Amino acid sequence: MLILRKSQDRGYADHGWLKSFHSFSFAGYYDPQFMGWGNLRVINEDRVAPGMGFGKHGHRNMEIISYVLSGELAHEDSMGNIKGIPPGDVQRMSAGTGVMHSEFNHAKDQTTHFLQIWIEPNVLEIAPSYEQKTIPKESKQGKLCLIASPNTKDNAVHISADANMYAGLFDQTQSDEFLLDPARKAYVHLIRGSLDVNGQTIHGGDALLVQDETLLTLSNGKEAEVLVFDLAP
């Protein structure tokens, strides 16, 4: 079963310096039907104005992933990390016993556009940690590339959660198939463009909540960038 969630049905908040779409209940947006999917808790699509950002704030017991689409995100945290996150990088922060961090757009004239993703951990109260990797465009072109995984042997950021996160770029005749365990859940988030998933066309900002399926076929992309999550039920 594939359940379509249209882009315009997401929560939305306009704070002036921050414009944010919420795929699931978050902050002032609450929808009891969309509290998460499996152990995926948050997907926020954020646009941060030049010179603005999120001041220092805390998290605990959450796997937090940032995926920058345009502009650059400046990260600083209580573990001593001071990093710039450009497009093409994936950043993972395991909050564990507690971490303080901030994110800013230090550009003078460019908005930073990124996704922030929260996944519930399968181990609580671990030591906080940070990881950042560059994902080459060619590794995502025409196929799904694993970018976050609980398996430390994978060439992806390591998360302490029963979930795998993939990214792909699809255009024209490019296609890929993704095998699913029907006992688990999956989530497809189309960042931009358009894409057919099992014959159903979705557009930028749309999502598919997937359960009881054994295969996803991604095809007929038009400048599509997509995230696919394999999730604990």
Task: Give residue ranges: language-model regions.
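Jelly-roll (double-stranded beta-helix
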Residues: M1-P233
